Amino acid sequence: MDLINQIKNTLIVSCQAIGDEPLNDSYVLSKMAYALVLGGSKVLRLSQVEHIKAVKQVVDVPIIGLIKKHYDNSEVFITPTIKEVDQLVDLKVDIIALDATLRTRPDQDLTNLVKTIKTKYPNQLLLADCSSVEDAINAQNLGFDLIASTLRGSTKQTKGHNNLENNYQFLRDLKKVITKPIIAEGGIWTPQQAKEILNLGIHSVVVGTAITRLHSIVKYWNDILK
């Protein structure tokens, strides 16, 4: 079974930390990744070279890899240039996630970046992190293998919107126009939500904050209990 079919109807757990986040430590994240796999996670979404290296030493599951890198001349920070792609290929991640919004990139535009990747690494699976239907259609046309809703609400154009509003309307809209497998990511907090999303025909769901960001989980509980 190929990897894309293998991850159908599965829970993908995002296990990431950067900057001053309290769990931003390769050893800590490797232990968390081990616990996630112990609990049944069959795919992980990971960022940053050292973290991915550490996790790969303790678990053997498919990895969706990305590198978060900020450049002064662009808002795009998820695997923004070919340099980050090269690093991820060297790490042998199974799928590379890239920002696939229509925003200005720090180096090549998205069209040329994808062309470069497909020339250098023709067998590399690519996942498009999108914020809008327009992003998703463009990414599909460029040849991305998977389309994700990761950046919904994270761009100026989609600020204030999310994947859950209006009974998952954005995900429903994607289903109408996207033929590639769709990955739902962003704002999913409960197993019930994940199940409802999968029942829409979405390929799989990614959950990060609700499982792996302990400070956010405690805040979520406290906000409800107030």
Curated annotation (Swiss-Prot):
Function description: Converts N-acetylmannosamine-6-phosphate (ManNAc-6-P) to N-acetylglucosamine-6-phosphate (GlcNAc-6-P).
Name listed for the protein in its UniProt record: Putative N-acetylmannosamine-6-phosphate 2-epimerase
Catalytic activity: an N-acyl-D-glucosamine 6-phosphate = an N-acyl-D-mannosamine 6-phosphate
Recorded GO MF terms: N-acylglucosamine-6-phosphate 2-epimerase activity
Pathway terms, separated by semicolons: Amino-sugar metabolism; N-acetylneuraminate degradation; D-fructose 6-phosphate from N-acetylneuraminate: step 3/5
Natural source organism: Mycoplasma capricolum subsp. capricolum (strain California kid / ATCC 27343 / NCTC 10154)
Known EC number: 5.1.3.9
Superkingdom assignment: Bacteria
